[in-house]
């Protein structure tokens, strides 16, 4: 199959603003050839399942050639694929299969650093005067850039590591085996764009750009969010927009919202509108830990406060929000006091901690409480931004805290109650990671096959909620208004989208307490409208002048559409 033959979806420039994303680890999703490692052929086999679930876009973490000392984020070749997970032709077939089902695909692209096994680094360390001599950041001293924090405090004592071959120190913001690229070198910039073009030419729908705040280093700064970094990222955006329209750039910048907004590159036009020439999307990291804090404290204020602190983003841009992913539940963007609280509540065993976070999946974090899992998912699907689900969370998969680093949340997808969870026909010892054997979360009780047969399962509930969300553009495009309310244990907000056929108004009411709670809401601006519950289509009493009273079960929630009654007094659905 040639690149020109690759299937590309139709033009829809802002598709990502209403999309539901799904992160899938290729090596853990499906092994079709009994090799013990999932591959692109296996992932292609399961595209019908992902289409059925309602996924709009797959996010695929790194699958490039790599020593795999950091789950593939240690890249050894930006245009090569790990042999055990397939070939370029296999990737083509997977990409076309996804597009044929209306599913887009973005992949991780690690700009900041490479593996120390990358040929660029090997050439740089062995030939300082050669063409790759200044592809990385080298120094005769380890005293430079002392204001830059060490990110992996558990394992790295410094951001500098001595290289015996070159006789100099090299700079790394992450693990010592991941040397940072030198973006002051124009050849490095060009090499990054060439590697991106390699994948975009195949019809890829975009990239999640990993660790973007750290591209440049400057004395007297913390080496994060520097002007030079923003200029480089704007160059990337221009390159993509000019050559590959309708593709998306999703930035990973684990920063405060006021800093992250700058990664959209907000610029004001003459007509007063604000556009973003840098990223299309950026993750809103601080929301995620505050959802966990709010529910455990039974108080809306952690969520309300961070939403109030979130600036408006440029037109045509979008947040990405998530509950869990392939990394630890990061606690960088909380206070020391809140971090200790989160560790005390959600990581009672020291093995559950990793760096500045918690390495657990969603279901174990919530003690496998179905009501809590559903509430968290409802918040994910209704708060501002495009939601990103993590593979296996739709069935309540567990984790394995006995595995090293973040591998405990990257175990094989549990499809059947058979040996190896329907992931592989290999002997168990050949699997790249062991399956979950836990009596609560083990594959005998938690698997896709069993939940498909049960209409009341978490899987069917998650699918139903995804499809409801996809029917209402207000969830992705609408404004957000926190309604407050009489009860601090209840978080209520309105998502509103103006339209030619009338405004689409969605009212979301969430009980963060484990006990039933009443709440009175000021809905006078919607007087006369009839709340229609979106899951069952049940109309509630019309909104009047008085505070609107609702009672919610423990960890319960409502999604309403506030409809205009027709001439018969019935709600307009």
UniProtKB/Swiss-Prot annotation:
GO MF terms held by the record: maltose alpha-D-glucosyltransferase activity; metal ion binding
Record-linked CDD domains: AmyAc_TreS (cd11334)
Gene that this sequence comes from: treS
Entry protein name: Trehalose synthase
Active site: 210, 252
Residues that coordinate or bind substrate: 70, 113, 178, 208, 326-327
Presence of keyword Ion transport: no
Family listed: Belongs to the glycosyl hydrolase 13 family. TreS subfamily.
